């Protein structure tokens, strides 16, 4: 087994003594740092490489913490001015994952970079910590790499804000196979197509 396989097995057993100790030390370290900060190297190199990271120029890792829990509706004094069914303020569940939120915040901070992917690294009672893989679209090492230069195209600006990263697509229910027939073109698009009566007019 290669070194990365051992790292992978360590991560699978998150309740093991080794990993519990490591995570406790690391989470203390992360709490002392800024909400969004650049990491020198990935905490989980095996996971980062599986998601497309390469230890070469043009690739950057940012670590970010996101507060856990529900999303409170931003209304003044809790006044929603609606029917009782829509008056909820506190117990509403955000429809996107915290990982998607983390990607979006990092994407706003490093607006000149492109978000490639992200992964979970740690959590405590208050926060979840993620590492986001970013790519510099202006760097020659990226522009000349046939595997990665697709992300230099302008249509990939702020992929994370439009639900085009892996976690964004998961939130949108977009994937392949028979389980995803009802979200193939998007949940709302499919609903509209299936609930719109279209009567074709034929002339003889």
Curated annotation (Swiss-Prot):
Compositional bias ranges of the Basic residues kind: 169-185
Classification via Pfam families: Ribosomal_L15e
Top-level taxon of the source organism: Eukaryota
Regions that span the bilayer: none
Alphabetical keyword list: Cytoplasm, Ribonucleoprotein, Ribosomal protein
Region (Disordered): 164-185
Any GO CC annotation of this UniProt entry: cytosol
One Gene Ontology term of the molecular function aspect: RNA binding
GO BP annotation list: cytoplasmic translation
Main location: cytoplasm
Locations listed in the record: Cytoplasm
Subunit comment: Component of the large ribosomal subunit (LSU). Mature yeast ribosomes consist of a small (40S) and a large (60S) subunit. The 40S small subunit contains 1 molecule of ribosomal RNA (18S rRNA) and 33 different proteins (encoded by 57 genes). The large 60S subunit contains 3 rRNA molecules (25S, 5.8S and 5S rRNA) and 46 different proteins (encoded by 81 genes).
Function of the protein: Component of the ribosome, a large ribonucleoprotein complex responsible for the synthesis of proteins in the cell. The small ribosomal subunit (SSU) binds messenger RNAs (mRNAs) and translates the encoded message by selecting cognate aminoacyl-transfer RNA (tRNA) molecules. The large subunit (LSU) contains the ribosomal catalytic site termed the peptidyl transferase center (PTC), which catalyzes the formation of peptide bonds, thereby polymerizing the amino acids delivered by tRNAs into a polypeptide chain.
PANTHER family xrefs: LARGE RIBOSOMAL SUBUNIT PROTEIN EL15 (PTHR11847:SF4), RIBOSOMAL PROTEIN L15 (PTHR11847)
Other facts: There are 2 genes for eL15 in yeast.
Family: Belongs to the eukaryotic ribosomal protein eL15 family.
Official protein name in the record: Large ribosomal subunit protein eL15A
Organism for this UniProt entry: Saccharomyces cerevisiae (strain ATCC 204508 / S288c)
Biological classification of the source: Eukaryota, Fungi, Dikarya, Ascomycota, Saccharomycotina
Chain's gene name: RPL15A
